[in-house]
Amino acid sequence: MNKFLIIDGLNLVRRIYAAIPDETDMQSLTERVISACTKLLRVHRPTHVAIVWDGHEISWRKQLYPDYKKGRKPMPEPLAQGLVALQDHLTAMHIGSIYAAAEADDVIATLAIKTAKAQGEAIIVSTDKGFSQLNHRHISQWDHFNQQYLDIAALEQKLGVERSQFLDLMALAGDSGNKIPGIAGIGPKSAAELLKTFRSLPTLFSSLSNLGAKQAKKLAEGKEMARLSYKLAQLQTDLPLNINLKDFRVIDSPPEKTINQD
C-alpha cells in the first residue's frame, strides 16, 4: 500500500525559522529543516513524500472575500530570499516540491483525498487544524513539533461538536486566525449549542422559528455570511494536479501501485 507523506512546507519551515535566534542564519534553518525531514522519513517510513509550497497568486478565497487572512505578517525577507536554496537542498534529499498557484492547503487536501481513494494512506504534516475536516480513515495528520497525531476526539471535545460539523461551526462562529467572518454575534459556544440541537446548517436555518427572536434575527441576517464562511473554510479536494506519483517515491522504497492524479 502506498503511504504518502505530504508536508505543509511553509507551516513547517516558518515554525522552525521562528525559533532561530538570528533571522539571517539560513544555514541553521537549512540544517534544522533537513533534520526535521530526515526524522519524518524515519518515523513514518513512507513510500512517497512531497513538500507543498504556497504560490504567489492571489487565492480564490481572497478574491471572494478580500479580508480573508487580512493582517497576516508577510514572510521575513531573509527567509523569502533563502527559500529557493532551501528547496534545492530538499530536492537533493529526494524530497520533491509541489508548488501551488496560491494556497498550499487545497493541493495538500487534493493529494490526501486522491491517495486515500486509491486505498493508500496519506499523512499530512502540519499544525493547521483546518485539515481536520478531511474525514477519511486513510488520512491522518501529524504534528511534527509535538510529535503526535492530531487527536480528533480531543478536538471534538474542545470544540463541542462532531468532526462532521467542523465546517458548520466555522460557518457560524468564523475563524479569527484566517479572518473568516462567520455570523456577527454568534460565538463558538453558542454555535456549538445550536449544532448540538439542529445538527446541520440546513436544519438550523429551516428551524429559526424555534429559536428566540433575538437569536433568530442574528441567524437570519447572517445566513449569507455563513454560506460564504463555509465556502472559505472548506478545502478543495478535486484540483487537477499535473504530477506523476513516481517522481515522489522515497528512494529504496519497494514498488507500489500508482494512483491516478488526473
Curated annotation (Swiss-Prot):
Cofactor(s) annotated in UniProt: Mg(2+); K(+)
Annotated residues for binding of Mg(2+): D105
Domain 5'-3' exonuclease: 162-257
A GO molecular function held by the record: potassium ion binding
SMART domains reported for this sequence: 53EXOc, HhH2
EC code: 3.1.-.-
Keywords: DNA-binding, Endonuclease, Hydrolase, Magnesium, Metal-binding, Nuclease, Potassium
Region (Interaction with DNA): 185-190
Binding site for K(+): L172, A173, P181, I183, I186
CDD domains found in the cross-reference section: H3TH_53EXO, PIN_53EXO
InterPro entries, A to Z: 5-3_exonucl_a-hlix_arch_N, 5-3_exonuclease, 5-3_exonuclease_C_sf, DNA_polI_H3TH, FEN, HhH2, PIN-like_dom_sf, Xni
Domain of life according to the entry: Bacteria
SUPFAM superfamilies: 5' to 3' exonuclease, C-terminal subdomain, PIN domain-like
Keyword DNA-binding among record annotations: yes
BP GO annotations: DNA replication, Okazaki fragment processing
Cofactor note: Binds 2 Mg(2+) per subunit. Only one magnesium ion has a direct interaction with the protein, the other interactions are indirect.
Entry keyword Magnesium: yes
UniProt family annotation: Belongs to the Xni family.
PANTHER family hit by this protein: 5'-3' EXONUCLEASE FAMILY PROTEIN (PTHR42646:SF2), FLAP ENDONUCLEASE XNI (PTHR42646)
Function: Has flap endonuclease activity. During DNA replication, flap endonucleases cleave the 5'-overhanging flap structure that is generated by displacement synthesis when DNA polymerase encounters the 5'-end of a downstream Okazaki fragment.
Protein name stated in the entry: Flap endonuclease Xni
Gene for this chain: xni
